[in-house]
């Protein structure tokens, strides 16, 4: 994962300073340890912390178009970027990188705000149209990638994490009491609320356009269930075939990377199915990772071992003890930027720290 951060002036005031956006993006180094990139002009400051996955040498952000009138910083991955790139090149667009980020730039040139409808991926995007002095923020359909923002002192400030916003001195630190009540009721805040007052999350499947000092947010995608249409009367085997086809296609697209790919194994059905597909559609040895527990009530190592033996993966297991959960709880709160009411996220965080030493996808 990468990290993005930015400052946009909503009124006439001093331009964003490099040290301001640098302070924000420094808070995101754990998301993108492979380098920082910046763009600043009179109106906006953009910063990006990069985790290199596609186009390791040439994919540094911000990415711009041919005449440098459109700039993009982006956290995530566009799975259908190869097909989109070919289509855009056929329409006359010229690329200077092999990255999936540049596809977003040229899609915007081609389709305007409808560019987002062409994306198959997980993403949070910030796009600056320098000619129109317009900022576009967009988040993927189900909100896999985070994006937060606040408005204060004539500025709109946004970032991948709240701690990045708080690194800016214009952003006050006040608890949102209503959001705290939501956490103890629903185990989570209700979007767009966060645990911090006047800091909001851009909802999944939404786009925000900031133009002439106005923030306009709209939903560009939603779940659709046609209740008036009768269900197809198909045998169970056909439904299973269609589901398998969709899963295979989803896994195949997500294997596009210029770095090694690994898989988590929980011992459950979902991770077992996905890992089996990955193993089938990759030529290189597959590394798998799992977490085990001292308490047999929570441990599923037996099921993990069965699949590891069946697939022949290169496996790494991490034993998470009760003391590990206790010791890592404060750091988990720092990462989640919210109240944690259960211990489940901590073992996954401990495992992820082990994984990131050799695998980033």
Identify the function of each model-found stretch.
Residues 356-361:
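Short, intrinsically disordered, charge-balanced linker/junction segments flanking boundaries
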Residues 1-337, 348, 352:
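Cysteine-centered catalytic environments shared across enzyme families
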Residues 342:
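Substrate-binding/specificity loop regions of serine endopeptidase catalytic domains
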């Amino acid at each position: 994962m990468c990290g993005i951060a930015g400052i946009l002036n909503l009124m006439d005031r001093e331009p964003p300073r490099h040290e301001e956006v640098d302070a924000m993006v420094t808070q995101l180094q754990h998301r993108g340890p492979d380098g920082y990139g910046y763009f600043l002009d009179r109106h906006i400051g953009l910063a990006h912390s990069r985790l290199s996955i596609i186009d390791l040498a040439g994919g540094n952000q911000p990415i711009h178009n041919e005449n440098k009138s459109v700039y993009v910083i982006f956290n995530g991955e566009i799975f259908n970027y190869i097909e989109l790139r070919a289509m855009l090149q056929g329409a006359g667009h010229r690329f200077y990188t092999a990255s999936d980020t540049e596809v977003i730039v040229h899609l915007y040139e081609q389709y305007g705000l409808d560019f987002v409808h062409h994306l198959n991926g997980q993403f949070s995007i910030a796009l600056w149209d320098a000619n129109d002095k317009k900022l576009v923020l967009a988040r993927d359909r189900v909100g896999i990638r985070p994006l937060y923002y606040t408005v204060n002192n004539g500025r709109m400030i946004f970032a991948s994490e709240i701690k990045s916003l708080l690194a800016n001195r214009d952003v006050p630190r006040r608890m949102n009491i209503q959001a705290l009540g939501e956490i103890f009721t629903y185990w989570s805040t209700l979007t767009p609320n966060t645990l911090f007052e006047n800091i909001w999350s851009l909802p999944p499947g939404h786009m925000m356009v900031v133009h002439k000092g106005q923030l306009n947010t709209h939903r560009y995608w939603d779940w659709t269930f046609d209740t008036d249409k009768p269900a197809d009367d198909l045998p169970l085997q056909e439904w299973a075939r269609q589901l398998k086809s969709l899963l295979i296609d989803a896994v195949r697209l997500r294997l596009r990377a210029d770095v090694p790919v690994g898989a988590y194994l929980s011992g459950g059905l979902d991770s077992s199915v996905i890992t089996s597909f990955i193993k089938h559609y990759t030529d290189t040895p597959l590394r798998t990772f799992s977490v085990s527990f001292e308490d047999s009530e929570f441990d599923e190592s037996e099921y993990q071992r069965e699949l590891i033996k069946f697939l022949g993966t290169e496996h790494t297991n991490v034993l998470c003890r009760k003391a590990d959960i206790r010791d890592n709880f404060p750091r988990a709160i720092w990462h989640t930027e919210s109240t944690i009411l259960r211990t489940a996220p901590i073992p996954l965080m401990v495992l992820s720290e082990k994984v990131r030493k050799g695998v980033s996808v």
